[in-house]
Amino acid sequence: MNRVTTESIASTAILVVMVFLFSWRSIEAANVSYDHRSLTIGNRRQLIISAAIHYPRSVPAMWPSLVQTAKEGGCNAIESYVFWNGHEPSPGKYYFGGRYNIVKFIKIVQQAGMHMILRIGPFVAAEWNYGGVPVWLHYVPGTVFRADNEPWKHYMESFTTYIVNLLKQEKLFAPQGGPIILSQVENEYGYYEKDYGEGGKRYAQWSASMAVSQNIGVPWMMCQQWDAPPTVISTCNGFYCDQFTPNTPDKPKIWTENWPGWFKTFGGRDPHRPAEDVAYSVARFFGKGGSVHNYYMYHGGTNFGRTSGGPFITTSYDYEAPIDEYGLPRLPKWGHLKDLHKAIMLSENLLISGEHQNFTLGHSLEADVYTDSSGTCAAFLSNLDDKNDKAVMFRNTSYHLPAWSVSILPDCKTEVFNTAKVTSKSSKVEMLPEDLKSSSGLKWEVFSEKPGIWGAADFVKNELVDHINTTKDTTDYLWYTTSITVSENEAFLKKGSSPVLFIESKGHTLHVFINKEYLGTATGNGTHVPFKLKKPVALKAGENNIDLLSMTVGLANAGSFYEWVGAGLTSVSIKGFNKGTLNLTNSKWSYKLGVEGEHLELFKPGNSGAVKWTVTTKPPKKQPLTWYKVVIEPPSGSEPVGLDMISMGKGMAWLNGEEIGRYWPRIARKNSPNDECVKECDYRGKFMPDKCLTGCGEPSQRWYHVPRSWFKSSGNELVIFEEKGGNPMKIKLSKRKVSVV
Ligand code: GAL
């Protein structure tokens, strides 16, 4: 059975590629306009079912099949944000290589015969580091992000214009024959506008007119922007948008973000939004006259390297989306939504051009009926009751409507789809472990860093500095080091008792080393980032070293003035001396940015000569601040691959110099007694991210996606930097096997 299904998945993959090759067609130049019902592309009104796939969250080798899987799932458009900090790493220096090859990505969408929706932002939120804005911009004097000030407006406009010109040059906008039919400026500014005062309003207006002045020939939108000027379309984001009305009556109803799942944090539980509820929300939207709908995300993918926002957003951005992180359709969600899309599209013309009537069929029961002059008719029958199934009479026929469901009758008679009746197949997902292998036997090379300053200190100060202002996010790591002299007369030395170290930090995480020994870790969590550490310390007479490794785990990506949120230590003291508490906050602190191996780029193939590695077949366990390097063969087969890091502590990993990202198999824990996990999830009733959580007591993220295209046929260099200690002998490459059941 399993073998058969694996083979059938392989042949489906071949088919997907063939369909892709043959479905190439160029889209004709088409002007895009709109009225109160829908977009008009060329001369045709169209319903748009769009799939968000963020290009830097996968690799170019995956793009064609991701786009094709979205198309097979019944989507006719792909949506992505544009990721400013990936494209402009330093002012005026642009990058469009590798995962950031946006032109290549859009051309793949075009070749698949799909439309493209481009959300330029360039502020994007998106659980992406710093909301997509380059960190350097925060340090341009006078800049306040998303507000009415010259530096922000200058850099934001320059970038937007650069992108628009690039895409115009490549003829990617619909009037040029390209796939882009819609664009977005800013992102959900309406939530924050009031915090920015009168200037906020001015900025919103300015960004809309700046966008419109770009003359791209396709409409611009702003999501969740209630006072959006009439030159742009205000759109809706959320779990449900059936009640949404746009900013002016001549605008179509656009749902820019329907969240079919949710994101995850290190230490957080697994969100789950049932397919029935996602389908319900989509059917309600189209039933109520919505005409552009986008799944955020349809493929969430991976926050490779240090791209995740936060703090604490996991490296995986799976999002429980219809296509999973590894690029495989998630069943039954993908299949159920595919069936839904088919049912909706049967009535496309009526939905956008027919006459709409809404009436009640009884308590919590509604009919949305579309008719035209020729007598054709389509109906969406909804049961809004979140507990009781209902029988309804519609046009002399009785229909059974499960609680919280919508039935679609494309001829006002035949129920072709009900959102709560899932007929799609399900799947079983396994991560099949495979030991690391090498043709000449596994040889580990090990390099351990010493806690504290390596080389010379970067600077010395009699205070605790802000972490982010110091590193400017060039690294996660910042060493705060000092030393104290303990007199032989201290009573605790004689009594054998231990003084207590007390540290306060704005976040995000901290490893403590006393006299070059690892003492412990303290960390904030997803909702409360500042933290305190209180731990007994064994001090000796004479000099004692205190080396504190403060870490960021993804910078804040949303909220008013989010770019000013700091991180790092704010107070350090030790209690239990003869004279009481020793306050070290204003002691002499020596600082060092980054860890040594990072500075020497030990993760880059060929850079190994920079330090002296120790070769061993058995690498040490539980050793902090250690680099591991091992040459491996690619895993067998062709399934997608995840690095199993369950045996490790926290750190970063690379394959052949490509950044896999941060790993941290941190256990999903309860922060309050209400933080439960569910055994069964009831799809009925309004969904919230904490409604159907699972994974209590398990690592939030155990496997880390390593794209197949990163492997060479042999001699692959896997490099790991482990901060606190773990057991590298147990690291495995697991193959993701999905069997249809
Ligand atoms: C929205 C935002 C998206 C993303 C989403 C949650 O409010 O626009 O960028 O952050 O929330 O995944």
Swiss-Prot record:
The enzyme's E.C. designation: 3.2.1.23
Keyword presence, Hydrolase: yes
Single GO MF descriptor: beta-galactosidase activity
Pfam families xref list: BetaGal_gal-bd, GHD, Glyco_hydro_35
InterPro entries: BetaGal_gal-bd, Galactose-bd-like_sf, GHD, Gly_Hdrlase_35_cat, Glyco_hydro_35_CS, Glycoside_Hdrlase_35, Glycoside_hydrolase_SF
Expressing tissues: Ubiquitous.
GO CC terms of this entry: apoplast; plastid
Active-site feature positions: E188 (proton donor), E257 (nucleophile)
GO biological process, one term: carbohydrate metabolic process
Residues carrying sugar: N31, N358, N396, N469, N525, N583
Domain of life: Eukaryota
PROSITE patterns to which the protein is assigned, alphabetical: GLYCOSYL_HYDROL_F35
Family, per entry: Belongs to the glycosyl hydrolase 35 family.
PANTHER family registered for this protein in UniProt: BETA-GALACTOSIDASE RELATED
Protein name: Beta-galactosidase 10
Organism from which the protein derives: Arabidopsis thaliana (Mouse-ear cress)
